[in-house]
């Protein structure tokens, strides 16, 4: 299992950053997600499911994303999701925004990637944390850059 937790400070309003996680905006911060459509939206968000399609090169994967946690207040925004990728990995990620000042937001991206069968466990050992760290850093930097574009 690989775990991560990355924190950065974004010089933008919390609402500006949070909008990047809307269904209509998600491709700005997740460019490999080519489709994200609601399947079952629950009141209060938790338990809602979405069909998401990810494409990198010629490889295309479609999977169901479930909202596990959700909070949306003036000072804190939080969403935790889970999905099974390629029948080999159970991935949980959480996105937390904390309002530091009017135009200063702390962004915490954390999660875990667990191999759920022999193939998944083997691939995680081969890929290691170095590749995962690059993916995490790239994502956090993309959120930062897109938030900066939106706030200017």
Where on the chain are the PLM-derived regions?
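Hydrophobic ligand-binding cavity/cleft-lining segments
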Residues: 1-45
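Hydrophobic-ligand-binding modules of eukaryotic lipid transfer/binding families
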Residues: 1-9, 100, 137, 141, ...
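Glycine-rich portal/gate segments that line the openings of hydrophobic small-molecule binding cavities
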Residues: 38-86, 138-152
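Short, surface-exposed coil-to-beta transition loops
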Residues: 3-5, 60-65, 89-94
């Amino acid at each position: 299992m690989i775990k991560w937790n990355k924190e950065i400070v974004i010089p933008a309003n919390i609402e500006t950053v949070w909008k990047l996680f809307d269904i209509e905006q998600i491709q700005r911060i997740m460019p490999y997600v080519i489709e994200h459509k609601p399947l079952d939206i629950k009141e209060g968000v938790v338990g809602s499911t979405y069909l998401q399609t990810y494409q990198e090169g010629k490889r295309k994967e479609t999977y169901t994303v479930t909202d596990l946690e959700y909070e949306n207040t003036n000072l804190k925004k939080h969403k935790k999701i889970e999905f099974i990728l390629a029948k080999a990995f159970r991935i949980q990620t959480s996105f937390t925004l904390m309002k530091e000042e009017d135009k200063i937001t702390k962004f915490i991206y954390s999660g875990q990637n667990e191999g759920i069968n022999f193939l998944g466990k083997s691939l995680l050992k081969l890929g290691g944390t170095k590749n995962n760290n690059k993916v995490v850093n790239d994502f956090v930097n993309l959120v930062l850059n897109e938030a900066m574009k939106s706030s200017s």
